[in-house]
């Protein structure tokens, strides 16, 4: 994930600040974050193979990795918004991240876990599970990019009502 970030960050310098921010949110963040979380799920699969029995386990493990990531990221966002903008800013950040989208990272990483769980159910070895893991990772990255992009390019609340709430 760090390598992806190192490659993508300099490329953003070629864009104007507004476009660079949008690309960072819609392209860079989903790739970097989902690869990092996906590696966590893959490590659970490789080293906890006896407890990784199928798609439901994959969803649960992926969701837990995503929840841990979201918890950590939210603490960082809350602290930064409090320092930079005070009570009003941290309140806005809390509503946006803590109430409107607490399960976004959970949902994205669960997709990666589901793909690995299906591979387990089919009897895949860790080596054979690499392609299903990549497929799940692509799904997670796409959902994350769609989610972040909705705040930049589309109607965030329409996506929230049609995708986030039902899931």
Predicted features along the sequence, with ranges:
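Hydrophobic alpha-helical segments at protein termini of multi-pass membrane proteins
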Residues: 1-167
